[in-house]
UniProtKB/Swiss-Prot annotation:
InterPro entries: Small_drug/metabolite_transptr (IPR000390), Small_multidrug_res (IPR045324). Belongs to the drug/metabolite transporter (DMT) superfamily. Small multidrug resistance (SMR) (TC 2.A.7.1) family. SUPFAM superfamilies: Multidrug resistance efflux transporter EmrE. One of its GO terms (molecular function) is transmembrane transporter activity. The chain crosses the membrane at residues 4-21, 30-47, 58-79, 85-104. One of the determinants for resistance to ethidium bromide and quaternary ammonium compounds. The keyword Nucleus does not apply. NCBIfam families: SMR_qac_E. PANTHER family: MULTIDRUG TRANSPORTER EMRE (PTHR30561:SF1), SMR FAMILY PROTON-DEPENDENT DRUG EFFLUX TRANSPORTER SUGE (PTHR30561). The keyword Cytoplasm does not apply. It holds the Pfam family Multi_Drug_Res. This is Putative ethidium bromide resistance protein.
Amino acid sequence: MKGWLFLVIAIVGEVIATSALKSSEGFTKLAPSAVVIIGYGIAFYFLSLVLKSIPVGVAYAVWSGLGVVIITAIAWLLHGQKLDAWGFVGMGLIIAAFLLARSPSWKSLRRPTPW
């Protein structure tokens, strides 16, 4: 459970850092540039802790997928980025993949055969 909490912290750090990239104007503005560096530092530190308890494939898929969805939603809501129906479908598929990655495998749900 702690791994999933650390994954949320890593995602939040990555989203904050990526959102600040635009404001940093190519690292020419000090405050947003500091937010980018600190945010990515937090993101990768907590991602490294996540990998102690969650398989790397699952952790990276969730981290990158949810990061893309959240950053796209922020850009759409706050910066007026255009998002058509296919964009919403794509984000829905990413969320579905997250839910599938988090679910137990079908093999673990099967009952052992008696013979």
